[in-house]
């Protein structure tokens, strides 16, 4: 059950963000979201989404955090859960899961420290900049829909953290400081900056230009992406992230995009990867965004394939298993399945 009627939601979102949204570069015409959603989100698809969101909502604690596993109270998991609810049209205080979205926002705002860094040190992994990037992204999406002075103030500080910790190569690494860089952490920050700029916050052009240069230099000859500029083989998850980083920076066509899309189509993981690869859901989260942006036959062939895998791997209780935690897996899966909704600005062309 979606939160709001599609046309009502898109009109409301457009009215809320039209005056603030500033794209990084001129964009191509989008796919028709009405047609795509009607064709691809069938009743059984919506039923799977509903079961997933219901399970996810049931795992949320009163303070907005999620779960009781090793990633309980993790900021990135809270942020992705918020994105999952938003992707179904559930917005702060509106829709079936509006209350859950409000809790996510409250938890993330409370997790920001005096410097603007969003992280719960006791409940993070080895890479807290993942937490910060995902949190900044979802807060920017929410602020663009429903401007709030408290969110804007904290969001602006979070953006400054990203801008000031970019390293000389143009990327970011695990910690909120200038050091090394890798493509995986970098994509989180690029999407966060794109969302923030769309919502009307200042992001220096120089920051974007430097990260575009970093991502382009990370591409291997086969079209995939290396982990760090020191070299290394291409892998599907980080290659999907690399393509989306370019799209998020406003690069919608060109040789890098073409070769990246070709690589992804040639290296799509088999269905069994979902149960044994820590990065499988992560890779498909970015790959579905890349194919949505690529459009045409790329999208029309990609979504049904990953859709079928997700429906087959959903658990009886509505969740999706992942080696990180089921809350993470379920949030990722429901975001992927709801991509045709085209609700969120960060996923729009």
Please state what every model-predicted region is.
Residues 1-17:
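N-terminal secretory signal peptides and thylakoid transit peptides that target proteins
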Residues 98, 105-107:
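Active-site-surrounding "flap" and adjacent substrate/cofactor-binding loops of secreted or lumenal enzymes
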């Amino acid at each position: 059950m979606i939160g709001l009627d599609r046309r009502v939601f898109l009109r409301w979102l457009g009215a809320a963000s039209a005056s603030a949204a500033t794209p990084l570069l001129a964009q191509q015409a989008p796919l028709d979201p009405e047609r795509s959603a009607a064709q691809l989100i069938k009743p059984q698809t919506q039923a799977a989404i509903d079961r997933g969101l219901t399970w996810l909502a049931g795992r949320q604690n009163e303070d907005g955090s999620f779960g009781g596993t090793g990633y309980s109270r993790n900021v990135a998991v809270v942020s992705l859960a918020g994105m999952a609810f938003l992707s179904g049209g559930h917005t702060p205080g509106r829709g079936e899961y509006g209350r859950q979205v409000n809790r996510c926002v409250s938890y993330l705002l409370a997790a920001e420290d005096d410097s603007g860094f969003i992280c719960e040190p006791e409940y993070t992994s080895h890479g807290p900049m993942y937490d910060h990037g995902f949190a900044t992204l979802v807060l920017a999406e929410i602020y663009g829909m429903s401007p709030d002075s408290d969110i804007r103030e904290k969001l602006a500080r979070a953006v400054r953290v990203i801008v000031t910790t970019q390293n000389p190569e143009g990327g970011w690494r695990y910690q909120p400081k200038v050091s090394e860089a890798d493509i995986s952490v970098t994509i989180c920050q690029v999407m966060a900056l794109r969302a923030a700029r769309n919502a009307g916050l200042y992001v220096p052009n120089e920051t974007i230009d430097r990260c575009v240069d970093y991502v382009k230099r990370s591409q291997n000859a086969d079209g995939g992406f290396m982990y760090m500029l020191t070299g290394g083989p291409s892998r599907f998850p980080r290659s999907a992230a690399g393509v989306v980083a370019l799209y998020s920076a406003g690069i919608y066509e060109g040789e890098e995009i073409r070769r990246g899309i070709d690589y992804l189509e040639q290296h799509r993981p088999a269905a069994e990867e979902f149960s044994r690869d820590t990065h499988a859901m992560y890779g498909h989260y970015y790959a579905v965004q890349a194919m949505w942006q690529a459009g045409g036959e790329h999208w029309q062939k990609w979504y049904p394939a990953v859709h079928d895998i997700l429906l087959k791997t959903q658990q009886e209780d509505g969740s999706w298993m992942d080696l990180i935690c089921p809350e993470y897996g379920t949030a990722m899966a429901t975001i992927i399945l709801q991509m045709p909704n085209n609700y969120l600005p960060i996923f729009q062309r």
